[in-house]
Amino acid sequence: MHEPAEKITINVWLNRWPMWQQLVDPIRKQAAEFNRRHPQYRAVVEAVNVGAFPREVARAARAGTAPHIAAYQYTYLQEAQDIRDPDGRPLFTSVTKAVGGREEILGEPVVLDDIVANMRAYYTFDGDLSSMPRNTSTVLLYSNIDALRAAGIAEPPSTWAEVEAACAALAGRDGARRAGITWPNFGWLFQQSVAQQGGLLADHENGRSGRSEKVDFMSPEMLAYVTWWRDLHRAGHYLYTGKQSDWWGCMEAFANGDAAMLVSSSVETGPIVRAARKAGFRVQVSRMPYNERAGYAGNLIAGESLWLRDGLDEPTRDGALALMQFLNNPRNATSIYDHGRTFVPTTEASIDLLASEGWFDQNPHYRPAIDQLRISPDSPATRGAVFGNFLPIQSAGMQAMHDVLVDGEDLAARFSRANAQAQQLLDEYAQHVESATANDGQGPQKMPQAEAERIRLGA
C-alpha cells in the first residue's frame, strides 16, 4: 500500500495543564491511531498552556493560522463564540451544521446523538451542538464512612440540613477533629450550588437565550448558599484552609482526618480514594448535597470541548469531523487514563461499554458522577452561565467569600461590592467586543493568580 503523496494536516490544539502535562499523551496516541486508519490524513496534536490558550487561538486566528480543532475550557464559551477570522466572520462553526445529518464520516460513526444528554445540552446553542465534549466532570461528596458510622450516621448526607446534623454528630463524637466538612473556595462550587436551587448567575437565561448583560451575585440562591457556608464555618463545622482554590489543601485535610467529609471534583475520585486507603479508612462517594428548602434542580458540568474551525475545504473539514467522532467512539470516550484521574465518559455507549466489562463493579466510586448527571434536569440553570471575563468574575465572588470567612466582613455588603465588581468586568468585556474584535488577542480576560495555581482538570 502506497502512502498518499501529500497528506492533509489536521491541527488540534489542546490545553496543557502545568502539573499534568501527560494528560495530552492519550489524545496523541488516539490521533496516531486515527492517522493509521486514515493514511491520507496527518492529525497533529499540540498542547498550549491553559492560561494562554484563548489568547493564542485569537492570535492565530488574526494571522489566518488558527487550528482546525481547538479545545476550549468551559470558562471560555463566550470567547469561543466571539472570536473572528481575519475577515470578521465567526472563527468556529457548529458541529451540528458541519455534520449535516450524516451518520458516518470517512467511515467513523457519528456520535452526536449518543452524547450524554446534559453534556450535549451544555454545549448546545440555538438548537445546534456548538462543540464536542472532550472531558467532563461534576462535583461530588466524599465521606469518611468509618467516621460517619462511628458517629451514628449510616449514610452520607444528601442535603444541607443533613450535612449540619452529620457535622454536629461528628463534633460530639471526636472533639479532636478540626471540622466535619471541607471544600475549596472556588467559583465552580458557587455555580453548582446556585444551579442546584434553580438559580441563575446571569440574565438572558444564564446567557443562553442572548448575550449576558447582567451578573447576579445577590440572588436568593447565591445568598442562601454563602450564608449556609458562613454559618457552618462559624459553628466550627466547616474547615477553611485560608487559601482560595486550595483543592490540594482540602484533599489533604480529608486524607489526614482533619475533616470527615470533602466536597470536590469528580476528576479527583481516584486520588481521593487511594489517599483514604493509604490513611486506613473507607470512602463513600455520593451526590453533592443540596438545599432541601429549595428542592433539587440539578447539577452542571465542567470540562473542555472541541470547536471546529469554519471555512475549511471539504477534505479538511471532514477529516477534522471524523477525528472528533473517533475521539468519542465508545472505547476512546471512556476517558480512563493511566494517571488515575477520571473524567465522566462522554457518550452513553462508552458508559455501557465500561459497565459490560465490569469496570464499575470493580470501581463503584466512579458511578455517582454519572448518576448525578443523569438525574439532573435540563434547564438554563443546569446548562450553566455563559459570559465573557468568566475567570475574573468568579474570582470576585471567591475573594468576597474569603473576606467573610477570614475577616468577618458583613456578608450582604461584601457580596454587593463583589457584584458591582463582577458587573464592571462584564461591561469591560462587552465594550471590548464592541470596540474591537475578539481576535486581537488583547481581551480583558486574564487568569487570576488563584486560577493559575489551580490544577483542576474539569473544574
Can you name each region flagged by the protein language model?
Residues 1-85, 103-109, 155, 331, ...:
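Conserved N-terminal structural module of periplasmic/extracytoplasmic solute-binding proteins
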Residues 77-138, 193, 282-286:
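Hinge/lid segment of periplasmic solute-binding proteins
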Residues 93-114, 200-224, 274-277, 287-298, ...:
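Short, solvent-exposed loop/beta-turn-alpha elements that line the ligand-binding surface or hinge
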Residues 167-168, 208-243:
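Glycine-centered hinge/linker elements that transmit conformational signals in sensory
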Residues 26, 30, 221-228, 314-327, ...:
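Short amphipathic alpha-helical coupling segments at ligand-binding clamshell hinges
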Residues 286-288, 338-405, 436-459:
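Long, aromatic- and glycine/proline-rich binding clefts that accommodate carbohydrate-like moieties
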Residues 189-192, 196-199, 227-319, 325:
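Extracytoplasmic/periplasmic substrate-binding proteins
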Residues 47-56, 160-162, 241-255:
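Short helix-initiation/N-cap motifs at beta->coil->alpha
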